[in-house]
Amino acid sequence: MPNFTGNTRPDPTLFEPAAFAKWIDTSEAPLLLLRSFLKEGIENLKQRFLTGTSAAELLPLHAWLVDQILVQACRLHTKKCPERVALVAVGGYGRGTLHPYSDIDILLLLTEETDSILQNSIGHFISFLWDTGLEMGHSVRTVAECQQAARDDLSFITSLMEARLLFGPELLFKNLQTAIAPEQIWNSRQFFLAKQAEQITRHHKYHDTAYNLEPNLKEGPGGLRDIQMIQWVSKRYFNTWSFDSLLQHDFLTVSERKELLESQSFLWQLRYGLHTLTGRREDRLLFDHQIALAKQLGYHDQGPHLAVEQLMKDYYRTAENTGRLNEMLLQLLEERILLVDAKVHVRPINERFQARNGFLEVINPSVFKHTPSALLEVFLLLQQHPEIKGVRASTIRLIREHRHLIDDNFRADSFNRALFMEIMRQSRGITRELRRMNKYGILGAYLPVFGKIVGQMQYDMFHAYTVDEHTLFLIHNLRRFALPKYAQELPLCSEIFQRISKPELLYLAGLFHDIAKGRGGDHSKLGAKDALRFCLYHGLSRDDSRLVAWLVAHHLLMSMTAQRRDINDPKVIQRFAREVGDERRLNHLYLLTAADIRATNPNLWNSWKDALLNKLYTATQQALRQGLEYPVDKKEHIRDIQNEARQALLKDGWTEQKLDILWSQIDADYFLRHTPNEIRWHIKALAQKEPHDGAPRILVRIHNQEPGTMEVFIYARAHALIFTVTTRTMAQLDLDVLDARIITTGHGFVLESFVVREAATIRAEADLEFRLQEIQEVLTQRLTQPDRAPPYRPGFIPRKLKLFKFPTTITFTKDRRNQCTVMELTTNNWPGLLSRVCRALASCQVRLVNAKITTLGTQVVDVFFICNQQDKPLTPEQQQQLKEAIYTYLER
């Protein structure tokens, strides 16, 4: 007699199995009845979830619901051959848990080869299931066929290990279990090695980090697969994957079991919610769904903490902890399975630690209990002994179990404070060990303010990493400046670093620079207070402590100045130099700034930003060495640039007379805003016959060898729409404007200088000449008759741009020295943005003098130096009119 042995928990609130079977037997339309029960049951479970029932409660109920449908359908279609086929749930469904749109995989296990009766029964059964609305994967095999397929396929043996009998002969199912046992195929050693390699490949696919901005809840590092990995390997070795049973095997501790169950429940909750939200199988936590999922799961904005940021922080912390447990437990299993017969080589390190086969371990399990400072010492030893490959899993477990010993008394101990500073002063392994300290929870325990930023993300497209990961990446970048093998990466940074007498001060500034993120208020000022307190508490001199605090307080100063101010202006340099104060601060700030930008987003750093910072550093260094009481005279600065450019041009064959004529036609500010090298290049256009025919003179060249970045110089008759048409054309050419400088001459001409970058794919070197020619020709055509240039039609808007919308803000300040208005615009980085702004400027008869374009992911912060038709700063009325015009054009 066939048996129903599905072991998921029955739920009489969905329906009662015996009565359900009776209804099926007496129904004239069992298909309609099953379809109706399935639909109603799924809706019932969905409503329970939306009203607060946990995913952990619903997953077995969902599996049980599907069990009933399958069992009744199988019973109906195998009446003629009940002893010859068993219905088996496999894979994730076999575990007895099912998400709303997860795969439903079944195996029809046969006693023998099929005949026509069995074949017809199976065919009708499968068709019937599809008609009920179930989407399944199925296979039909004998026990021998299952064994052979499993022998050759890691995924299939894993799927069969999770098999669960739903309906049919128990003996047949037991024969399958015997056939795939470790004694027959895939012993625990073979299985461990194969699954270990599989996990490494899977993690590589997700960049080996749990901190992806759009993580995969199932497959990503720290996801559900990492928990299942522990269970699969345990099943092959211990013949159980129950966390309770693994506790009895002394493989898991009570706290580890609790952590695994909590992580699993949280990840289940997210995945169940994601399936419910999207109405399909979706395991990727895309930006599209993060806000809605946070709301669905009951998160609310709390002060500076957005609901979505709280959700993602919980996810990252859970995933990171799951990853740590996965790594530690697999290492413990590796020692039991692979290294049980390995030759042991033990080398003493000191009275507390020894190296066993290349891994550091405690000599006595009570080391941390009796000597809590060893919780820091372990990381110092790893720095001092580079031959040691890592920490043994048993010692990692002890570290985790004794983290609670790092309390106020521990932090107040002068020996422990000295140990921490010794770690920061080492010549090697600083980044690696800080990351390991973070991984084991020691860094957050010793620095509670750091613990608060672990897993904290910012919901934008600018910050690619969580705050803690970004911080450690910044320190990694600082360390690269110290290493000769990376000297060619950023030569100036490497050169300056050699002059830093106490690198630990830089590392501390990096550690604290974002430590106050998420508290509300100015994180730079708040972090500076934390840094000063920490440094003084850890025995640093008052002078060194103040330097670290100053760096934290001003860590954005240099990048903001370089990217939003006209650093060709000596007055800007003078103001910046006064804020910095001395060359020691300048050196530290420059290194911190470069490392910070490079650690924020892999796409943020380029040679253009490198050149800007380099230029600001060099000019400020010169101002400081000259003395702040002797500022650079603007006229003298212009004369120096003219003379340097003149000498180069004379060597090129130009005459003094010709250069004097050219110089007289150009406003003095032109020489302030351009380098001698740029002037030398521009002369090619300026020396040509003046464009009275309406055709502009245009030059295009590659900029600083940066892939995809170019310089464009335009010499044309002044026209109200000239800048609007230029920026519109660049948008149509898929060029992003990084920098723009505009000079109007006294005889009715305009000089436009741009640094632009390919918005899309960087082109191959072979295509560059064609691309430069294309840009030149299209700009020439459009600017010859600006009035007839085609209107801009925005193209495809990327998905992420639509998701991250920021409020538009416009502020005006007066630059009295240069008699212009500085307008700062913060808004979304829509395609053609600059063209729209320029149309607004033209409509208000506002003249653009200079522009600094800064893109922060999907947000831009653009600074425009503007004046009215009288070359004066805008009046309050003109500012309001322009603001309204910009809002109007941005909304179109």
From Swiss-Prot:
Region (Uridylyltransferase) location: 1-348
* Gene Ontology terms for molecular function: [protein-PII] uridylyltransferase activity; phosphoric diester hydrolase activity
Q: Name one GO biological process term.
A: regulation of nitrogen utilization
- Indicate the segments forming the ACT domain, all copies: 711-786, 822-892
EC number(s) stated in the UniProt entry for this protein: 2.7.7.59, 3.1.4.-
Keywords, alphabetical = Hydrolase, Magnesium, Multifunctional enzyme, Nucleotidyltransferase, Repeat, Transferase
Coiled-coil regions listed: none
* Segments for region (Uridylyl-removing): 349-710
Transmembrane stretches in the record are none
Activity regulation annotation text: Uridylyltransferase (UTase) activity is inhibited by glutamine, while glutamine activates uridylyl-removing (UR) activity.
Origin, by domain of life?
Answer: Bacteria
The family database entries (Pfam families) matched by this protein are listed as: GlnD_UR_UTase, HD, NTP_transf_2
Q: Which reaction does it catalyse?
A: [protein-PII]-L-tyrosine + UTP = [protein-PII]-uridylyl-L-tyrosine + diphosphate; [protein-PII]-uridylyl-L-tyrosine + H2O = [protein-PII]-L-tyrosine + UMP + H(+)
Query: Entry's PANTHER family?
Result: BIFUNCTIONAL URIDYLYLTRANSFERASE/URIDYLYL-REMOVING ENZYME, BIFUNCTIONAL URIDYLYLTRANSFERASE_URIDYLYL-REMOVING ENZYME
Q: Which family does it belong to?
A: Belongs to the GlnD family.
Entry comment, domain topic = Has four distinct domains: an N-terminal nucleotidyltransferase (NT) domain responsible for UTase activity, a central HD domain that encodes UR activity, and two C-terminal ACT domains that seem to have a role in glutamine sensing.
In Swiss-Prot or TrEMBL terms, this protein is called: Bifunctional uridylyltransferase/uridylyl-removing enzyme
Query: What organism is this sequence from?
Result: Nitrosococcus oceani (strain ATCC 19707 / BCRC 17464 / JCM 30415 / NCIMB 11848 / C-107)
Q: Gene that codes for this? A: glnD
